[in-house]
């Protein structure tokens, strides 16, 4: 909106050219989303408390979690609101990639909202039936995947970029739709599984979004893309502004979600943010780097798969409890130690992933 306004006024008022610069809009995006989150936080928390929308805690979980029972949840609403408002203000709304990410994020947000609503309002601990949750996640992901495939068919936008190999970029064809589906749905559910401790999911999300912001800028810059031997995709640079909005909104939410949390994001936040990260990774053609950057999300998901598989096949559990962050809690690690160590791991993985852009 502001980008369009600046474009309209710039011929008469050269000062407005500043609002067209990507770096300026990225900085303003962080600040806008951060301020909006900080402003909305106390108001949303008070409203959730008034409506008695509190966290449901499993009876078989760590005893330290019993004190979390009743803590306001569905705080992801303020994250999504801050990101959406910021995107509408500071991005170029003629860019189709912006709308693709927002569509997935808000669509998954609705799925998560229904899931949370059934848990906390209808007192149904299972929330939305799993098959319906995956059905709607799949519908949204497949619609976006098909639309993106038709938009970039047989171009660099549908190639697979393989880390460490500068000349290995196979054209995916229809496999692009399959890959996109699994990346979006998989990342969404991985972030959802990680969201089990105060601040555990939001800070890695912020870090990965920051890493994706750099990749989006590099991919959208013809000279830098050539220097790094990655595909040049002109529309991706605008994703920098959206990524920084995620960073700002996430940091604002962390203000209230840090240990001991005043609010949890709920599925409305975790499913939506995971879906957004997956979509961004697809758009910048770095799905494999997302696996590295989001290593904590991958680790949490794999721990659940191994736990369930081992119990069904052998009747034995590998971990004391899954996802794996609960395993460390039951080993006696204080919650803040688990959280901060997972943050440090994520920071290392994001830096490693960015370094691979040059190691080719």
UniProtKB/Swiss-Prot annotation:
Cofactor requirements of the protein: Mg(2+)
The enzyme's E.C. designation: 2.7.8.13
Pathway(s) the chain acts in: Cell wall biogenesis; peptidoglycan biosynthesis
Main location, first listed in the record: membrane
Gene Ontology biological process terms in this record: cell division; cell wall organization; peptidoglycan biosynthetic process; regulation of cell shape
Gene Ontology cellular component annotations, sorted alphabetically: plasma membrane
Membrane topology of this protein: Multi-pass membrane protein
CDD domains: GT_MraY (cd06852)
MF-aspect GO terms: metal ion binding; phospho-N-acetylmuramoyl-pentapeptide-transferase activity; UDP-N-acetylmuramoyl-L-alanyl-D-glutamyl-meso-2,6-diaminopimelyl-D-alanyl-D-alanine:undecaprenyl-phosphate transferase activity
UniProt cross-references to Pfam families, sorted A to Z: Glycos_transf_4, MraY_sig1
Catalytic activity: UDP-N-acetyl-alpha-D-muramoyl-L-alanyl-gamma-D-glutamyl-meso-2,6-diaminopimeloyl-D-alanyl-D-alanine + di-trans,octa-cis-undecaprenyl phosphate = di-trans,octa-cis-undecaprenyl diphospho-N-acetyl-alpha-D-muramoyl-L-alanyl-D-glutamyl-meso-2,6-diaminopimeloyl-D-alanyl-D-alanine + UMP
InterPro entries listed in its UniProt record: Glycosyl_transferase_4, PNAcMuramoyl-5peptid_Trfase, PNAcMuramoyl-5peptid_Trfase_CS
Locations listed in the record: Cell inner membrane
NCBIfam families the record matches: mraY
Protein's job: Catalyzes the initial step of the lipid cycle reactions in the biosynthesis of the cell wall peptidoglycan: transfers peptidoglycan precursor phospho-MurNAc-pentapeptide from UDP-MurNAc-pentapeptide onto the lipid carrier undecaprenyl phosphate, yielding undecaprenyl-pyrophosphoryl-MurNAc-pentapeptide, known as lipid I.
Stated family: Belongs to the glycosyltransferase 4 family. MraY subfamily.
Protein name according to UniProt: Phospho-N-acetylmuramoyl-pentapeptide-transferase
Lineage of origin: Bacteria, Pseudomonadati, Pseudomonadota, Gammaproteobacteria, Vibrionales
Encoding gene (name): mraY
């Amino acid at each position: 909106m502001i980008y369009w306004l600046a474009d309209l006024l710039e011929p008469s008022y050269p000062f407005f050219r500043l609002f067209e610069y990507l770096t300026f809009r990225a900085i303003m995006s962080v600040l806008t989303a951060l301020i909006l989150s900080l402003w909305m936080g106390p108001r949303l928390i008070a409203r959730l408390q008034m409506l008695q929308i509190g966290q449901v805690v499993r009876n078989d979980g760590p005893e330290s979690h019993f004190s979390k029972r009743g803590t306001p949840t569905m705080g992801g609403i303020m994250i999504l609101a801050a990101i959406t408002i910021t995107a509408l203000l500071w991005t170029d709304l003629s860019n189709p990639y912006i709308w693709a990410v927002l569509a997935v994020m808000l669509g998954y947000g609705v799925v998560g909202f229904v899931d949370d609503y059934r848990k906390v309002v209808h007192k149904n601990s299972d929330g939305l039936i799993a098959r319906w949750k995956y059905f709607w996640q799949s519908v949204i992901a497949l619609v976006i995947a098909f639309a993106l495939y038709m938009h970039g068919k047989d171009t660099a936008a549908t190639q697979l970029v393989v880390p460490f190999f500068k000349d290995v970029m196979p054209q995916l064809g229809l496999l692009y739709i399959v890959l996109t589906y699994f990346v979006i749905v998989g990342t969404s559910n991985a972030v959802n599984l990680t969201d089990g401790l105060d601040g555990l999911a939001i800070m890695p999300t912020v870090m990965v979004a920051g890493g994706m912001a750099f990749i989006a800028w590099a991919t959208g810059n013809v000279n830098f893309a050539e220097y790094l031997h990655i595909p040049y995709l002109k529309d991706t640079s605008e994703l920098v502004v959206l990524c920084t909005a995620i960073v700002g909104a996430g940091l604002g939410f962390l203000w209230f979600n840090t240990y001991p949390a005043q609010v949890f994001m709920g599925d409305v936040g975790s499913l939506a943010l995971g879906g957004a990260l997956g979509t961004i990774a697809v758009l910048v053609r770095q799905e494999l780097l997302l696996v590295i950057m989001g290593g904590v999300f991958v680790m949490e998901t794999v721990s659940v798969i191994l736990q369930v598989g081992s119990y069904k096949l052998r009747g034995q559990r590998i971990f004391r409890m899954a996802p794996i962050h609960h395993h460390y809690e039951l080993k006696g690690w204080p919650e803040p130690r688990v959280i901060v160590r997972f943050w440090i791991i994520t920071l290392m993985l994001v830096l490693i992933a960015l370094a691979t852009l040059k190691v080719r």
